[in-house]
Structures are given as C-alpha cells and as structure tokens.
UniProtKB/Swiss-Prot annotation:
One of its GO terms (biological process) is DNA-templated transcription. The keyword Transferase applies. Belongs to the RNA polymerase beta chain family. One of its GO terms (molecular function) is DNA-directed RNA polymerase activity. GO terms for cellular component: DNA-directed RNA polymerase complex. This is DNA-directed RNA polymerase subunit beta. DNA-dependent RNA polymerase catalyzes the transcription of DNA into RNA using the four ribonucleoside triphosphates as substrates. InterPro entries: DNA-dir_RNA_pol_bsu_ext_1_sf, DNA-dir_RNA_pol_bsu_external_1, DNA-dir_RNA_pol_su2, DNA-dir_RNAP_su2_dom, DNA-dir_RNAP_su2_hyb_sf, RNA_pol_bsu_bac, RNA_pol_bsu_CS, RNA_pol_bsu_protrusion. Transmembrane segments: none annotated.
C-alpha cells in the first residue's frame, strides 16, 4: 500500500490483504466523463475531428439539399464558446451550465443548365450560426440543469446484430421448438425470420403480418431455382442398366433407413439389408472401406425433390419444375422422356430438412413483382402499390443508410455470428447477410449450432451519456432538416444567408427535453459521496428503448456468469426494479463498442505476468481464467497441480499450462459500495445487498469518523467522488482560512501559467437531499503537498477517507425487550456528545410577482402582525443570517394587493363611524413550515433587470465583490512575488548597461542595488546579454497579460453580479432562505451497520443504566443477538471482534504517547508501532514529530483494512486481540448498569461501525387539524407533503359499524370530510357555543350523481315526505 500521501502519513491503515494489486483501479467516474468528452470533442485536433459524437451527427444530417437540387447547405465545423455562467453561478441562479454551440455552415447555390441538366456552382457563402446551448459536464461527472445537479444514467440495451432463439416449446402444445432469428439494427426496421408449427419459414418486418421467407428472397432478386441452389446441395443421380447410381457420402447417408437392400454400385454386393438404419459409425466405416457409390431403384427415388427445371430442349416444354417432389406417376413420365441423369436436392429429412422447399411450394408469390407488392401491402395496408413505390419502399427498409443503421457494433456482431467479413463501415444489410441469417436458422432447425443467450453480456451493451445525447441531438437536427428544406424552397436562394435558413429551436428543444424529462436523466442522489459515485456508475435496463418493469422476466434480472468482474452481483435495489438496475464492478470499464470489459493478468507458459489485458464477455468466453486468490510462488508460477478456473460460464479444474488469464484482484467482481463492506465473504448475499444499498442512505454526520475496520477502498471513494479536495499541482500552502486554501505551485512553473492555485471550499451548502455539504481544510500554512494529496475533507470524509458513520461500542445482548425485532438501544452519551447528530439544510423561496391588481411587495410592513413576530427581519423584510427560527416564524415579509371585497352592513357602519379604510393588501409572507426549526445560514436575493435593489441585496453584493477582490489581490500578490523573484535571479550579478533614473551605467547589479528601486522599475535594467534580455522581455509580456487577465476576470464577475438576474416571466424579485436544522438522534430514527443489519432506535437510556465492562466503560449501543443467526450476516460479529482489538491497540499506543509526553522517550512508541504494523515503509520514513502526531491519531483505535475476499482470517483476528491484551474469544464479562450485578454469561463486546440513515422520524411525523381539501371530491388531502389528514378507510368504517357508533360514523363521513355546507355550519355552531349540528349531503355523492348523468342516466333525489330534495344544482 503506497501510503506516502500527506494524509496517509497522519493515519496509517494496517493492511490485511495478501494478494498484490497489479492493475490500477480506473477513476470511478470515468464512465461518465470519457463518454461525454468523446461526444463533445471540445478541442478540435489538427486535421479535423474524428467522425464520432457531435461531428458524426452533423455529418449524417448535412449536407441538406432543397427539393429541386438548386442549392445545398454543407456543414464545415463546429466550436464551443465560453459558457455564460460558471458552475457555482448556475447553481445559485437556477440556470443550466451550458456552452453556446457555433456551427460554420456553407451554402452552395448551383446553376442548372436547362438542356443538359449539368450543374455549375454559382455562389458559395459561409457563415457561423448559433445552434443552441449544449449542457457541459462538471468536473464530477454531473450536469447542472435549472440549478440542480443531475446525472445521466447509462442504459443497458440489447446490442444491435442478429440473434437466434427458440420459444422453449411454449407456443405449440406438442412442445416442439420453434426457432426464430431477429436482426436488430441500431435504428431502422427489425427483421424477424421464424418457423411455424408446420415447419414453414416466415419473415416479419417490424413485427407486422408474416410473409413466407421465399417472398423476401424473391424481392431480393432470387428466383425459385436460385433459392433452392442457395440452401441445398445438388446431387446427380445417373441411370444405369440395373437402376440409379448415387455417389456415397457418409455424412449424407447417416441415419438412412433402407427400404430394399443397399447395394454397392461397383461390385453389386449388399452393403446393408433392407429395413435397417445406417448408423453414423457404420456409414463412416463403409466410406473408409472404399464404397464409392450405391445402386438405388426407381421406388427409392420417390419422395426426393428435383433441383432444377427439367425442360425439353427442342420444344421448351417443362416436364417438371425445380423443387417438385418425385412421385410414382411423374417417375414414369420421366422414364418415358428418357432422362439419363436427374439433379436432385440433398434432402433426406434426417440431416437436411425440406423447410425452404416446402415454403417455396406454399408461397403464393411466384415473381419478384408479386413479392414486392405483398411486402408493400403488409407495410402500408390500404395503399394501392405500384411497382416503383413498392421497390422504393423495400429498398428503403434495409438498404438505405439514411433509414437503416446497424452501427459498427451491429456489423461486428453480425460478422462474428454469421462468419462474414463485411467491413464495419457497411452499416446497412446486404443480400448475403439476409441469406446467411436464413441459412443459419435452417441449420439450427436441423440440429446444427447453438441458439444465443440474450442475457449474455456479449449481447447487451451500454449506452452512456455521450451516445444517448448523440441520439437526442440527431432527432433534433432531423426535425430541423425538414424545416430547412421547406425554407430553402420558399425563399430567394440567391440573397439568403445560412443564418436565415436555420431555426435552432428544434435542436435546442430536443436537448432540453432530454436533460429535463428523460427517464435516464435523474436528480442526483447526493446524500453522501458514496451515493453520488454509485449513481454515476449505475446501469439501468429501463428507459426509452429499454425494458419495462412489468415485461421484464426472471431471466433478465438474474445474475449471469458473464457478469463476473463487469456487473456487481450484489448491488441492486430491492423491489420491482431488482436486477434491472445494476452497478458497474470496481475495475470494469466500457469499451468503444459499448461492451463492459474487465481486466485480467496474462498467463504465459504457466507463469503469471504483470501485463494487464481488458477483455469483454465475448472475448473471455474463448479463454480459461483463474481466480485472483490462486496460490503463486514468488516467480508467479502456480503452486498447485490443478487450478480452479472459469471457462465459458463453467467452473472447472485445469492444469496450470492450460490457464490463459488470471483475475487482477479479488474485489473486481463487486461494485464500489459492496467493496466497502468488510468481511463481505462472511455475509449472506441478501444482507450484503441491503448493506450496500443502505450505505448510500447514510447521512453525513457533524463529526465524521473513518471506520476502524475498513477495506482500503475508503480513500479511493473520497478522492474520486470529489467530496475531498485533492491538490491539482504540488506546492506549498501559502494562505488558508475556513473558506479557501491558497497553494503556491512548485512544480512545472511554466511562466505562462499562474503559479497560484486557489481552492474554494464549500461551506454549509445544501445538497439535493437537503444534507449538508461542508468542506474543511486539513493543511497548515507552510505544509508541502504533492499533486493528488488530499488538502480538505468534505462531507462524510475523515482525513481523506470515506466516513459514513461512527465507531461505537456495542454489546450483543437482549435488554428488557427494548431490542426486540431489530430495535436498537442507545446510550444517552451518543445524544449528549453529538455522535450521531447531523445538519440538514432546508431551502425556502418566495417570489414577488406582478399581479393584475398591482405588484406584490417584499417588505417589513405587514398588516396585523405584531412587532414581536418581525423581530428577526431587517428593514427590507428579510430574515437576518444567524437568526433562530421555529415553525410559523416569518422568514420574508410579503404583501399582495387584494381586490375590493363586498362589505357586510356591520363593516359599512364601522367604516362610516371611524372613517378608517380597511387595508387593501393581504399578508402572504413566507413562513417556516410546521416541524422545522433551525438557524438561518444563507439568504440570496435575486432582482429582475431594471428593478431597484433593496438594502439587503446591495449588502450581499458588496460582500461578494469583496470576496472576489480578495481572491484577485492574493493571486496578484503571489504572481508578483514569483515574477520579481525570478527577475531578481536573472538580473543579479549581471553588468548593467542601463537602468532606472539614478542608476550608474556599467555598474554590477546586486540585490542591494535592486532594493533601492521600487519593483515596478526593475524592468528598466538592461544587460548586454541579448538572450537574457529576450527572456526578460518574454517574462514581462507574460506578466502583463496575466495581470490583465486577472483584472478582466474580476471585472466580468462583478459585472455579472451587478447586472440583475434572469427570473421567470412575471417575477420581479425572488428571495431564497436557507435554514440549517440540527437533528440529534432520537427514538424512531433508522440506523444500520454495513452488513444489512438495520433497525430503529427504540429507547435512549441514561448512561448509568447501560451495561458496562469491568473497567467501567459503558456500552454505547445494545443490539439483539437473535438478529445474527437467521440473517447469516456473521460479518458484523467479526467486525465487532476486530474493532475491539483496534480500540485495544489504540489504547496501548495512546499510553506510549503519554509516556513520551511525560518522559520524552519515543522508543516505546516505535516498538509498539512495529509490533502492530510490522516492517511498514511509511512508518519507517516518519520523523519524531510525525510519529507523535500519528500516535495521537491512532489512540482512539488503530485503523485496519481487510479487503473483500482477501481479508483478515480468524487467526489474524485472534492474534490482533492477543496483541491488544484482550481475551481471544472476543467476549467479556458485562455488568448490568441498573443493579451492578454481572450478567450470567460473557457477552460479545466490541466496536462496530454504525450509520444513521436518511429515514429520520422528524421527516415522517406529521399532525394537522384543518387543512387543504381536494378540488373535486372535497375530501381532505393525504400525506405529509400535502399537509393532509389521516384516512378513515373502509376497515375503520366497519369498526365503527361493529360498535354501532352511528353518530360518530356519520360525523366522520360527512362534516369531518366532504359535506361542504355542513363543515361551515358546524364551525358556526361551535363558535356560538351550540353543540348540535346536522349532516348534509357529502360532495362525493354529488360527484357520483354527475358521473351517472354524464353517462346519460338522470338521477334525482326524492325525500319521501317533502318531494324532490335539493341536490347541489338546485342549491346553485
């Protein structure tokens, strides 16, 4: 383990893995970034871009010609301009982070000679055209769309190509297998070829009505004879005196049943008696003995088929047609005609079936024209076909590159499956391809070859962001193409420019629609860094062009042998999507064809090399692959005689010389989340699945703590997710505060680049899931960092390692029934010391619109509100930062004008007496919703252009400008320092031939001389050395440019700040308020370990009542031991033991650190560390101060890494426990905190890593009295989000009926629900102090009546005493 990083020296993980890792793990979000980069190709390389991505889209749609061919619009190139706003600005303003796309188009106008029709170029015009904005990907592989971060999930779909399958005997009652072939293009019509129960072969185009496959072949230009000669061999039967002489072929005659004796035509001997069957072996033996030909009689020819038309050459009369069956009758006729030889088809019904011949005879169509008409009628029913239209339509189905595209993948797959050798630029079908497919299908029916497995990863491919976007953009451009063609025909083409022909709206709309509402464009799961990474590595089989949940069967969802090392067998959701949404394995990557590849080490002559090769599922099938944990000697040879290997989905032992490849790492078969579970190999798969899913729901805690028992993957996840900040260049820390780190770069000091890196840290930002994103620096001024070192921790990271939860002391024992059924008992210490406290940031926004009655206003002056309620608002009516607010408090004061409402007589009287005009505005302030209380951490004010900014907006703007100016000044200062130091180095000790005012010519320039003048005048010094002067001049030029660039960037940003914001139409002003809510853990919150052991906190017990150990330490958490055996997740127990050892060792190291602090003796610390870590390179390289810091960091517990499938064994755990001076059983005597008595048996105690999940009781608990009602039924809404009520459902009604509580029931169903008039009456009655009221007609009854009337049934209510009752209309 190379732990020589900055953070790696502060905390060293003891590593238990034995297998060395040869391959570097690829960057975990490479899938997203590489795909989109390939699509955009922002920088145009020399010699133009390759034909892929955006370039390919433009190339495929352009050139566009008008209908008459007089003009043509060509694509030249495209380029991106700078995005208008950067990532942070887009997040804040709710914009999309995108770059404008500029396309250079060339319009060519032709002159057409009217007589000859020859074209000559009349005019060429080139112009740059704006083609909409293309969203850009952020550094972390996400997109910012309308201010929110989104991820485009990669889709798994069936690879284009040809597939052979059968119906598994389900279609026909006899259980006969009906074979079918399907050619799937990337885009275009599907072609199916299938057998029916009578063994006739049919073709279907786009799943429409089937036509005989011979019609398809007629349409391709074959005739009956050509069809037969394509599918069958021709055998010539020659007439001799004794009968017919037939060449003998063992393959053809195997399984032949004789009617008469088989006789050798040359010797006349009987080879096989009548009534017997010729076996394969017997046939082969006969051939070996030299049997050349057989003699057959006339009757044995009956039932064969003719291969050619038999025609009388003189008269042209056809005696028999190709494919005709020989019967006794026509045999006689042929004999009479005197045919000496007959060409017959090699159909024997055993090895070769007569399927195509039977199809040919069953086909009504006899000619190409008939066939084309038939296909036309199938594709376009109801339209009368003409030969031209039918031909054009058939041509466009499979042979037109505009409409049909197999894609390179499809062509490669097709060549592989059918043994063809078409180049992969041939993207349409050819006649040979279709015939090959039919041939292969017929062979399958004859029992030759295998069908395909559609769940094999060689037959499924991944479409990543770039490709999905490419398809979307192509759709947009094609929509645009139609409009362009029409416009080219309708305008005067001589005066028009490309700009006038193009309307980029359809293209931009297609992109916007894809990012905004596609099923694959998802709101990023940002609960913690792991959930971000997993979301970006997700593979979904759903989405447009994919499967649907309802249709997907069991096979698609199941784990397939080819998933090994490519798709994780563990991580997938529980529920309806199981197996349809998967995760990429740790080492997997997607190749250029979209197939998932996994790395293997090459094995040469039984020796494992360090050469790493990536193989796709198809390639892997050809090789034999050994597991990563096979024992090797130091030279890389296998130590065992038989090695267990995988080959073509089977596991089998082979000898070492037969092994081709070996796995690179044991964790290559699982995904990132599963690779974070220690002792995964000891957990049941179902629980491991829950464990990997629940880690993604862990909330970032206030104090992150890395696990004692990790797997070594923690650092990788923290780095690749972008949560922890890594240094871009090596350098020295120059300045630092809570919000930024400034590094002076020391490597590649190219004078053209800035020598300063400023890293802005995110402080208390809200994530998509309302968790808190906060980064804090890990470095001090003067620290030296290398490129890639972690300089700041983010949410859920600790010293550059992923830290989703906390290590807590656990006891596995029952406790008074409080941990029944997976409940969790917690100690009060956990709450008091904020162990599981998390911060959540809620965002509230309010808009002031322009209404018909006048503009809304954001103000502190709100009618009928006490001064007490306004105490947290500033003069602009917006809450202060730092104010503590609770439910119902005003965050932003807002008033809305209201129309004049009719006054009651009493109001009129009061108005007349007091002359006071009632205020004509109502209070529509933004208030804190119920169930929220917290602290205001940020306020943002957005104003429309041209609207005056209020005090608060100006204050925020001033603050922001100051921050930008500070950044500029710091960068400027470091730039000055670097440049002038370099300049002084160049000038010192040189002869000066010129200089600033007062400098004596020909004096030697020294540091003292330089100090006399201000630095800005140093440039005036000159020396006779021309090379030196050229260098100084270049440096000065560069310095001036850098300075100018800095100033310009600063001014641009300030201008953007002051410009005003783009708000939705009708909105004058918008205010966003962010409230930070501190959530301590409480009963009802959900917690979980990493092994799928989840539970709900049932009680928080005072510390003194918790069970305690002999040294008086109280357990933090008590779990039920019964949760382990039936769940079979024993990993949690091993983790507990190992965690116990880690803490014990940490205690010992802590004691040696204390010894150093008191006696200044570092030897005990060094010895202890050596015992724990063995000969660790990192520890040897540390100096005393670093050792003390390390010891201090380890005193809570020594962190260890036990990688998946290659971790600590039982013996290792026992050894660690002994080293820590603990009982090797891992159990301890535990005392009851309430009585002080020891429990009867020893208890398993140790440290386990627990997570607090995002299912918090505060977000779920909900109460209401009166709230909103549904519009149609007038019943109360349901659910917390709608502020709904509790449903009084059917079963609850039965309960009240059973008790005979009639009045209560009536009340529930009427006045407490949807009796509108009754509700108001009840309210009035209660106000009057009257407690009697009557129920009316529920609104839902009126809805039912209306519904019946809409069906034409008039329903009237009649009251038996009073005549017709008033329904709602009557009331109206």
């Amino acid at each position: 383990m190379a732990q020589q990083t900055f953070t790696g020296r502060k905390r060293v993980r003891k590593f238990f893995g034995h297998i060395k890792e040869v391959a570097e793990m690829p960057n975990l979000i490479e899938v997203q970034k590489a795909s989109y980069d390939q699509f955009l190709m922002v920088d145009e390389p020399q010699g133009g871009r390759l034909d892929e991505g955006l370039q390919a889209v433009f190339r495929s749609v352009f050139p566009i010609s008008d209908f008459s061919g007089t003009s043509m619009l060509e694509f030249v190139r495209y380029e991106f301009e700078q995005p208008k706003y950067d990532v942070d600005e887009c997040r804040q303003r709710g914009m999309t982070f995108a770059a404008p796309l500029k396309v250079t188009l060339r319009l060519i106008v032709f002159d057409i000679d009217e007589e000859t029709g020859a074209k000559s170029v009349k005019d060429i015009k080139e112009q740059d055209v704006y083609m909409g904005d293309i969203p850009l990907m952020t550094m972390n592989g996400t997109f910012i769309v309308n201010g929110t971060e989104r991820v485009i999930v990669s889709q798994m779909h069936r690879s284009p190509g040809v597939f052979f399958d059968h119906d598994k005997g389900k279609t026909h009652s006899s259980g006969k297998l009906l074979f079918a072939a399907r050619v799937i293009p990337y885009r275009g019509s599907w072609l199916d070829i299938e057998f029916d129960a009578k063994d006739i072969v049919y073709a279907r185009i786009d799943r429409r009505r089937k036509i005989p496959v011979t019609s398809l072949m007629f349409a391709l230009g074959l005739d009956g004879e050509a069809i037969l000669s394509t599918f069958y061999k021709k055998i010539l039967y020659k007439r001799t005196k004794e009968g017919w002489r037939v060449p003998f072929d063992a393959n053809r005659f195997r399984g032949y049943s004789t009617i008469n004796d088989l006789i050798d035509a040359d010797t006349g001997k009987v080879v096989l008696e009548a009534g017997k069957k010729l076996t394969v072996r017997a046939a082969r033996q006969l051939q070996e003995k030299g049997l050349k030909a057989l003699r057959l009689s006339d009757e044995e020819l009956v039932g064969n088929y003719l291969a050619e038309d038999l025609v009388n050459p003189k008269t042209g009369e056809i005696h028999a047609e190709a494919g005709e069956e020989i019967t006794d009758k026509n045999m006689k006729a042929l004999n009479e005609q005197g045919y000496k030889e007959l060409p017959l088809l090699d159909i024997d019904h055993v090895n070769v079936g007569a399927y195509i011949r039977n199809t040919l005879s069953a086909d009504k169509n006899m000619t190409r024209e008939d066939a084309l008409f038939d296909i036309y009628r199938v594709m376009r029913p109801g339209e009368p076909p003409t030969l031209d239209s039918a031909q054009a339509m058939f041509q466009s189905l499979f042979f037109d590159a505009e409409r049909y595209d197999l894609s390179a993948v499809g062509r490669v797959k097709m060549n592989m499956r059918l043994d063809l050798d078409a180049p992969d630029t041939q993207r349409t079908l050819r006649k040979e391809d279709i015939l090959s497919v039919i041939k292969t299908l017929v062979d399958l029916r004859d029992g030759k070859g295998e069908i395909d497995d559609i769940d094999h990863l060689g037959n499924r491919r991944v479409r990543s962001v770039g490709e999905l976007m490419e398809n979307q953009y192509r759709i947009g451009l094609l929509r645009m193409e139609r409009a362009i063609k029409e416009r080219m025909s309708s305008v005067d083409i001589d005066t028009v420019m490309p700009q006038d022909l193009i309307n980029a709206k359809p293209a931009a709309a297609a992109v916007r629609e894809f990012f905004g509402s596609s099923q694959l464009s998802q709101f990023m799961d940002q609960t913690n860094p792991l959930s971000e990474i997993t979301h970006k590595r997700r593979l979904s089989a759903l989405g447009p062009g994919g499967l649907t949940r309802e249709r997907a069967g069991f096979e698609v969802r199941d784990v397939h042998p080819t998933h090994y090392g490519r798709i994780c067998p563990i991580e997938t959701p529980e529920g309806p999507n199981i197996g349809l949404i998967n995760s990429l394995a740790t080492f997997a990557r997607v190749n250029k064809y979209g197939f998932v590849e996994t790395p293997y080490r090459k094995v040469k002559d039984g020796r494992v090399t360090d050469e790493v090769v990536y193989l796709s599922a198809m390639e892997e099938g050809r090789y034999t692959v050994a597991q990563a944990n096979v024992p090797l000697d130091p030279k890389g040879r296998f130590t065992e005689d038989l090695v267990v290997c995988r080959h073509a989905g089977e596991v089998l032992p082979v000898t070492p010389d037969k092994v081709d490849y070996m796995d690179v790492s044991p964790k290559q078969l699982v995904s990132v989340a599963a690779a974070l579970i220690p002792f995964l190999e000891n957990d049941d798969a179902n629980r491991a699945l829950m464990g990997s899913n629940m880690q993604r729901q862990a909330v970032p805690l206030v104090r992150a703590e890395a696990p004692f028992v990790g797997t070594g993957m923690e650092g990788v996840v923290a780095r690749d997710s972008g949560a922890a900040i890594a240094a871009r260049r090596s350098g020295v820390i120059d300045q630092i505060d809570a919000t930024r780190v400034v590094i002076r770069a020391t490597e590649d000091l190219d004078p053209t680049k800035s020598g300063v890196d400023i890293y802005r840290l995110m402080k208390y930002q809200r994530s998509n899931q309302s968790t808190c994103i906060n980064q804090r620096p890990l470095v001090k001024v003067g620290d030296i960092v290398k490129k890639g070192d972690i300089i700041a921790d983010g949410p859920s990271t600790d010293l550059g390692e992923l830290a989703l939860g906390r290590n807590v002391l656990v006891a596995f024992m029952p406790w008074n029934g409080y941990n029944f059924e997976d409940s969790i008992l917690l100690s009060e210490r956990i709450v008091k010391e904020d162990v599981f406290t998390s911060i959540h940031i809620e965002e509230f926004e309010v808009m002031a619109r322009d209404t018909k009655l006048g503009p809304e206003e954001i103000t502190r002056d709100i009618p009928n509100v006490s001064e007490e309620a306004l105490k947290n608002l500033d003069e602009a009516g917006i809450v202060y930062i730092g104010a503590e607010v609770r439910a119902g408090d005003i965050l932003v004061g807002k008033i809305t004008p209201k129309g004049e409402s009719p006054m009651t007589p009493e109001e009129k009287l009061l108005r007349a007496i007091f002359g006071e005009k009632a205020s004509d505005v109502r209070d529509t302030s933004l208030r804190v919703p119920p169930g929220v209380q917290g602290t205001i951490v940020e306020v943002r004010v957005f104003n429309r252009h041209g609207v005056d900014k209020d005090e608060r907006a100006l204050a925020i703007e001033r603050e922001e400008i100051e921050r930008l100016a500070k950044d500029r000044d710091d960068e400027q200062a470091i730039l000055d320092r670097n440049v002038y130091n370099r300049l002084a180095e160049l000038l010192e000790g040189r002869q000066g031939i010129a200089g600033p005012k007062g400098f004596k010519k020909d004096t030697k320039i020294t540091r003292a001389v330089l100090e006399e003048y201000p630095k800005s005048q140093w440039w005036l010094f000159a020396s006779p050395n021309d090379k030196l002067m050229a260098e100084i001049e270049a440096m000065r030029k560069q310095y001036d440019e850098s300075k100018k660039g800095l100033e310009q960037r600063f001014l641009d940003k300030v201008e953007k700040l002051q410009r005003g914001d783009e708000l939705p139409p009708g909105v004058m002003k918008m205010v966003k308020v962010f409230v930070a809510v501190k959530r301590k853990i409480q009963p009802g919150d959900k917690m979980a370990g990493r092994h799928g052991n989840k539970g709900v906190v049932s009680k928080i017990v005072p510390i003194e009542d918790m069970p305690f150990l002999e040294d008086g330490t109280h357990a933090d958490i008590v779990l039920n031991p019964l949760g382990v055996p039936s769940r079979m997740n024993v990993g949690q127990i091993l983790e507990t033991h190992l965690g116990w050892a880690c803490a014990g060792l940490g205690k010992r190291i802590g004691q040696t650190v204390d010894a150093y602090l008191s006696k200044q003796d570092i030897k005990p610390l060094k010895e202890t560390l050596k015992k724990v870590y063995g000969e660790d390179e990192t520890i040897k390289s540390l100096n005393d101060n670093e050792l003390i810091e390390l010891g201090h960091n380890l005193s809570r517990g020594v962190p260890i890494a036990t990688p998946v499938f290659d971790g600590a064994k039982e013996a290792d755990i026992e050894e660690m426990l002994k080293l820590a001076g603990l009982d090797a059983s891992g159990q301890s005597t535990v005392y009851d905190g309430r009585t002080g008595d020891p429990f009867d048996r020893k208890v398993t105690v140790g440290y386990i890593y627990m997570l607090k999940l995002h299912h918090l009781v505060d977000d779920k608990i909900h109460a209401r009295s009166i709230g909103p009602y549904s519009l149609v039924t007038q019943q109360p809404l349901g659910g917390k989000a709608q502020f709904g009520g509790q449903r009084f459902g059917e079963m609850e009604v039965w309960a009240l009926e059973a008790y005979g509580a009639a009045y209560t029931l009536q009340e529930m169903l009427t006045v407490k629900s949807d009796d509108v008039a009754g509700r108001t009456k009840v309210y009035e009655a209660i106000v009057r102090g009257d407690d009697t009221f009557e129920a009316g007609i529920p609104e839902s009854f009126n809805v039912l009546v209306k519904e019946m009337r809409s069906l034409g049934l008039n329903v009237d209510l009649h009251n038996s005493k009073m005549g017709p009752a008033p329904t709602s209309e009557a009331a109206e």
